[in-house]
């Protein structure tokens, strides 16, 4: 199964977490497209946009990291783009709770677009990789919706 790993990538801590998670998932037999490691030859907004959009199109599933007080805007767009095409797995290891009671930890458009939700407050990157792998194996067919 080919996964597009969406998530914030603007700090060294975020990039390091993403890289560790991708390596662990690959060790579990998952092919991972990690945007931060797929730099286009031309480093401009259009090239990055096209590269990431194409990465989503070539993947079977989008796994989106939803940590932080509010999910990353680029990650939210990637989920919206993928929604009508393929399953989405939302992952949150952040113990901070956003949202309102009964509406989920973030915007309802994200909450309701997900095929699988993984909530693992305080989880290590190893625990997170295992939970994502379990979720991916529970998705019977990665065919478009």
What are these regions (language model features)?
Residues 1-145:
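Conserved catalytic or regulatory cores that recognize and/or transform ribose-phosphate-containing ligands
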């Amino acid at each position: 199964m080919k996964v597009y790993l969406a998530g914030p990538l603007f700090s060294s801590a975020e990039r390091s977490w993403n890289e560790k998670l991708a390596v662990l998932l690959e060790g579990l037999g998952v092919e991972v497209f990690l945007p931060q490691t797929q730099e286009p030859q031309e480093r401009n907004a259009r090239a990055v946009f096209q590269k990431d959009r194409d990465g989503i199109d070539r993947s079977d599933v989008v796994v989106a990291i939803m940590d932080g007080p509010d999910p990353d805007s680029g990650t939210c767009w990637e989920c919206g783009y993928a929604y009508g095409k393929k399953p989405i797995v939302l992952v949150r290891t952040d113990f901070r709770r956003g949202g309102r009671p009964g509406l989920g930890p973030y915007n309802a458009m994200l909450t309701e677009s997900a095929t699988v939700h993984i909530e693992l407050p305080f989880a290590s990157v190893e625990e997170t990789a295992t939970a994502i792998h379990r979720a991916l194996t529970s998705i019977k067919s990665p065919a478009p919706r």
